[in-house]
Amino acid sequence: MRVIGITGGIGAGKSAVLDFLQRNYKARIIQADLVGHHLMEPGNATYYPIVEQFGSQILNGDMTINRQKLGAIVREDFGKWEQLNRIVHPRVKEYVVNEIKAAEEAGMDYLFVEAALLIEDHYDAICDELWYIYAGEALRRERLKKVRGYTEEKISQIFERQLKDEEFRKHCRVVIDNSGDLEDTFRQIRKEL
């Protein structure tokens, strides 16, 4: 089984790539963000450490973590963003390692793990290779405004904290250019697999 890490800047089209991989290959797909959200649910691995670190003001009435409130706190303070990452990311990675074992036992051909901090969190140690899903900054900004309704200010804040193109290219064996139409993107993927 090949374990492939998928990364790229926000708005690059990683979700479209993952959808294609899920539909066309015998593969297990893991999205680190979704795992992180699951781990934040009451009783799960990161719930109590996050509440302890950020206080009860991040909780909804039903005691679940309000991710919008938490997000607003960490967007405003880089130190708090780093604190949150120190709580969440090691536990997400532990989950991924366990899922790799399970996928191997299930006879999967591929396991794709998508994570924003794939490079920073050293997923190269557990992946056979890393892929960078690329789209230019102007196109990504346009997608984020249109699809997610993000403001320029919010987009700039997010971009500021993400790796630059040259860093992604330095660490990833494969670059999939997702600037054109999706058929071209899918053709590049088929060539690699």
Pin down the residues of each PLM region:
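Hydrophobic anchor at the beta1->P-loop junction of P-loop NTPases
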Residues: I6
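Short beta-strand-centered segment that lines the nucleotide-binding/catalytic pocket of NTP-utilizing
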Residues: A27-M40
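ATP-dependent small-molecule kinase phosphotransfer cores
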Residues: H37-M108
